[in-house]
């Protein structure tokens, strides 16, 4: 097959000007965030906080190194556009090889490294972003900033690995509940369980002077992280993972550091996953019962709830169920990149069980927001679930619900747990949970 390239000099000249402008925006963005991302300050004066800060600082330094390579590619690309069509084609081929080699070296470091780098890349473009304040649902909620060439450049760079960041990737590989790999993931066997498991990684809580206890509620295991000096405040933390993954190391880091820095006791329900027979019809009432038990024991003002992704689904569905049963609700709730409408994937059908996928127990986006506590919703513009957060915002406005939203530009799914920018928002979230001044 013969391929043809049609080169229009005037069009290429205009394109070169646009691309050069994009490069200027990206360069300015990278410079603007260099200090914040390469020298992340420790949240407290302790070894664990310093280690976490060093980890994210290393991520920022890696991104700056990659940005330098991309700048070389960009400069050559602009030169190629300015030249003749033949020169453009040759330069594009040469620079594509250069860019490919950079990503190839990352691939050689393993799947986990690639996943982390991809998750960090979009966040580094948010120049000047520190901490996004929430806005009430009654206000006009939009993602701060407007689409730009930098956004297109960023999204284009992520396109080859887009499936890794999408829930559809989980659907493709894990759609069948009896998949042997799903059984392995849920097996809680080391060393896999150190990264995806039903208990914190070894030594983490010992280093923080915390006590980890294992109890059960209605047949559901509950992990309790008690700090050295508890304040009497309790957080029910519901992990995400598309209803098929146990808590990750990022969840346990967040829960443990939160308990350490605030003195709140964190309770993590290990609810049955889809491959273990878990369905919305059984898990949501059990989750609501656990939260109600905590409220009965410690008082409404001392109990709050946080959930990310699928955990955000469970948190909202459980609160709606508590209202429907006439039970008190927690003092506040924080939803991080919540998956509120599970759609029609095979995983969704399995989670729904005998219920319709638009039943509020399955997809709480279709439930009532009346009677719910003050709720804070975090979402990012690059999150496939961001549209659901916008729909929730509109519903909250119509129903007059006490909801506030953080719609952050250039942020990915679960950015609060996975990126340096999320780390900056942890103190704000602790305040919203009522466990920090």
UniProtKB/Swiss-Prot annotation:
The disruption phenotype is: Cells lacking this gene show a drastically diminished ability to hydrolyze stored long-chain triacylglycerol.
State what inhibits or activates this protein.
Answer: Also inhibited by CaCl(2), CoCl(2), MnCl(2), ZnCl(2) and MgCl(2). Inhibited by several hydrazides compounds. Stimulated slightly by SDS at concentrations up to 2 mM, above which the activity is severely inhibited.
Chain residue ranges for the region called Lipase: 207-437
Q: Which residues form the active site?
A: 309, 383, 413
Q: Where is the PE domain?
A: 1-100
E.C. no: 3.1.1.3
Q: Where is this site: Cleavage?
A: 149-150
- In this chain, the stretch annotated as Linker covers 101-206
Q: Name one GO cellular component term.
A: cytoplasm
The protein's annotated catalytic reaction(s) are: a triacylglycerol + H2O = a diacylglycerol + a fatty acid + H(+); 1,2,3-tri-(9Z-octadecenoyl)-glycerol + H2O = di-(9Z)-octadecenoylglycerol + (9Z)-octadecenoate + H(+); an acetyl ester + H2O = an aliphatic alcohol + acetate + H(+); a butanoate ester + H2O = an aliphatic alcohol + butanoate + H(+)
- Any keyword Secreted? yes
A GO molecular function held by the record:
triacylglycerol lipase activity
Tree of life domain: Bacteria
Matching InterPro entries? AB_hydrolase_3, AB_hydrolase_fold, GDXG_lipolytic_enzyme, PE-PGRS_N
Post-translational modification note: Upon export, the PE domain is removed by proteolytic cleavage. Cleavage occurs at the cell surface and is not required for secretion. Cleaved after Gly-149 by the aspartic protease PecA. May also be cleaved before Leu-98 and after Ala-136.
Tell me where the sequence motif Involved in the stabilization of the negatively charged intermediate by the formation of the oxyanion hole sits in this chain.
239-241
**Alphabetical UniProt keywords:** Cell wall, Cytoplasm, Hydrolase, Lipid degradation, Lipid metabolism, Secreted, Virulence
Q: Is Cytoplasm included in the keywords of this UniProt record?
A: yes
pH dependency? Optimum pH is between 8 and 9.
* Function, in words: Catalyzes the hydrolysis of both intracellular and extracellular triacylglycerol (TAG). In vitro, can also hydrolyze p-nitrophenyl (pNP) esters with various chain lengths, including pNP-acetate (C2), pNP-butyrate (C4), pNP-caproate (C6), pNP-caprylate (C8), pNP-laurate (C12), pNP-myristate (C14), pNP-palmitate (C16) and pNP-stearate (C18). Also hydrolyzes monobutyrin, tributyrin and trioctanoin. Overexpression results in increase of virulence characterized by reduced survival of infected mouse and increased burden of bacilli in the lungs.
UniProt remark on domains: Contains an N-terminal PE domain and a C-terminal catalytic domain, which are connected by a linker region. The PE domain is involved in aggregation and activity regulation. It is also required for ESX-5-dependent secretion. After transport, the PE domain is removed by proteolytic cleavage.
Recorded protein name is Triacylglycerol lipase
- Species the sequence originates in: Mycobacterium tuberculosis (strain ATCC 25618 / H37Rv)
